[in-house]
Amino acid sequence: MKKNKDNQSQTKVNKELLNAFKRYVSVYSPSGNTHKISTLVFGDLASLNPDNIFTDYYGNIHAQFNCGEGVTIHLNSHLDTVPRTQKNRTIKELGGIVYAYQKNKRAILGADDRAGVTAIFELLDQIVVKKTLPFKGTLLVSFFLDEEIGCVGSSKSDFEFVQQADFSITFDRKGNSDIVVGTYGVAFSNQSMCEWLQSFSIQKGYDFTCVEGGISDAYTISNDMGINSINLSVGYYNEHTDNEYLVLDELENTIKFASELLLNLHKPINEGLTKEAPFTNSIVGKPKSYSYQFEPTAYYDNANGVVSITDGQVTIDCLNEFEIDKLIQSLKRAKEMMEDDYYNWK
């Protein structure tokens, strides 16, 4: 969180932000069943009159906003929620914290990653509609599908569109102050950008810190597309569980931090800091054991399974034959993260 926030932001709920979040999180669209949220998001993007808007062959949504001369920044989040997200949830807010209920019991909220979707639209509202954020440059926006089952959407997206970017920001991290710059020994941003980001956070009075985190579409963008990337906290906790919740103040704080980044990223970019490939930094360690919880999409209601990778061995439990195609895709994404001479793949 920012250290010098005003008192009002701590005591008054941002109703506009709450309503925007509820608009997206209320839509039931788990992995493999994202038509409803895709239709809503595409319509909302189109209403902003972007210079370009399209869906790629997998169904990911992309848009471009030309905002004058300057650098090119890519903003992204994913549209799907985990496959076990319940239908007919009721979204409630109490004291600035948002929960989901189904039949009077706590349920998966889906802030992972509808909070990220909300953050991007709030930034676009400031830049394109209200014009209160004087960003100069080009904004590329992507909403990826099926991140929750192995970053499938981003791995099948329009690489050429994203590769126009000088830098990419993913909005898909739990907590309130993480700048994820790598995962499981794989860097998202180079050392120079990590140092600049950490210094910038301190200079502007924020508590955001460069850390190693979990898997997100930032992995695909950095390692498959070669773009220096980060993944920012957006204020959700206990994701993928019935105890999931979102802290609105923390989401709002991330939007403020991201807005300041957008106004200042031209500095490291013009200094050439993003020209170095995003493959090493001092934050991430060596590749380590990795476990992936595989969950089926909605149309395989009776299936579930676990893929675990420990001490160089892959174990697959409780999978039936109908999940093999999706399992293979998930394993391919995991395999790309590992060193072939360290892990024994079977």
How should each PLM-predicted stretch be described?
Residues R23, V27-G70:
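A non-catalytic alpha/beta surface segment that caps or lines the substrate-entry region
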Residues N52, L133-T138, G205-V211, H266-A277:
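Flexible, glycine/charged-enriched surface loops at secondary-structure junctions
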Residues K105-L109, D113-Q191, C210:
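Acidic/histidine-rich catalytic neighborhood of metal-dependent amide-processing enzymes
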Residues T209-T254:
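Zn-dependent metallopeptidase/amidohydrolase metal-coordination segment
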Residues N281-K346:
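Positively charged, low-complexity terminal tracts
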